[in-house]
A protein has these predicted regions:
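C-terminal helical subdomain
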Residues: 189, 206-242, 246
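The beta1-alpha1 cofactor-binding region of Rossmann-like NAD(H)/NADP(H)-dependent oxidoreductases
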Residues: 41-42, 61-74, 107
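Conserved mid-core segment of classical short-chain dehydrogenase/reductases
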Residues: 95-111, 155
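Canonical Rossmann dinucleotide-binding motif of NAD(H)/NADP(H)-dependent dehydrogenases/reductases
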Residues: 2-35
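Residue(s) in the substrate-gating loop at a strand-loop-helix junction
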Residues: 146
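Active-site helix of classical SDR
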Residues: 125, 162
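Conserved glycine-rich Rossmann-like NAD(P)H-binding loop of the short-chain dehydrogenase/reductase
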Residues: 31-47
């Protein structure tokens, strides 16, 4: 697939940050329709107004993607009002950090993080994948995971767990589609380090792990998605943690991750932008 021209694209967490950039990219490529999902009503309305009138039909839905009933109802509305979705970008996410796990609030922190980061992409994909599979044209599922899904990291235990789960689920769906002989639907899993969207305000860069600019992440993710690529890991030095897991004892890995790569103290000054989409 060279571009999304003529296709219908749905993006979660679309009101700001990378979600909005994905929407702008789809419009620039002359998508037939772009559907924006978000829970921030004011930002969603503002983005809708600013993206309307650029040659693509843009619609917005106020959706709590962590609520299964809300996802199913909104998906039914999209299918009835807009039509089948060709490209689904699971971008919505939250991060709660700067606490040790035992200091966190199970209802406010753990439940929210798992609902939005882990369950939501599954709910949304389940709602639209059957139509993508049944459709005649090329289709894409782009899932935003995180570099945190590859390595343990202090002060973000639940976030890391939520992204580990997304990576396992997303790549398993890729394999299921392949095993089922569905050649026209491709799944791409994107795993960036901290992205400069405001969501990770206060998080530190590390010697081998710079804070990433959202436009760069969106460009790399979009290019891989269109090409049908399986994984995008940014920066590539993130994969050092995977290499270390298989080569050295855990104590040595911890020492290198802490003192050489420098990742274990990156969340100490985290403030974040609570309950905002990525």
């Amino acid at each position: 697939m060279k571009s999304v021209q003529g296709k219908t694209v749905l993006i979660t967490g679309a009101a700001m940050g990378m979600g909005r950039l994905f929407a702008e990219r789809a419009i620039a490529e002359k998508a037939k329709a772009v559907v924006l999902w978000d829970l921030n009503e004011a930002a969603l309305q503002r983005t809708l107004e600013e993206l309307t009138g650029r040659g693509t039909d843009v619609t917005a839905y106020l959706v709590d993607v962590g609520d299964l009933a809300a996802v199913e109802a909104s998906a039914a509305a999209v299918l009835a009002e807009v039509g089948a979705v060709d490209v689904l970008v699971n971008n919505a996410g939250v991060v709660r950090g700067n606490q040790y796990f035992w200091e966190s609030d199970s209802a406010r922190d753990t439940r929210l993080t798992v609902a939005v980061n882990t369950l939501a992409p599954m709910y949304v994909a389940r709602a639209f994948l059957p139509g993508m599979i049944a459709g005649p044209g090329e289709a894409r599922l782009l899932n935003l995971a995180s570099a945190a899904g590859f390595t343990a990291n202090p002060r973000m235990a639940v976030y890391a767990a939520s992204k580990w789960a997304v990576i396992g689920w997303s790549d398993s769906v890729r394999l299921e589609l392949k095993q089922a002989g569905v050649e026209h639907v491709k799944v791409t899993t994107v795993c960036p380090y901290y992205v400069n969207t405001g969501m990770f305000d206060g998080a530190k860069s590390a010697p081998l792990l710079p804070i990433l600019e959202p436009a760069h992440v969106v460009d790399e993710a979009w290019r891989a998605m269109c090409a049908g690529g399986s994984f995008v890991v940014l920066p590539r030095t993130v994969m050092l943690s995977e290499v270390l897991k298989g080569l050295v004892p855990i104590g040595v890995r911890d020492f290198i991750s802490d003192n050489v790569i420098g990742v274990y103290h990156t969340m100490e000054d985290f403030t974040g932008r609570v309950e905002q989409q990525a």
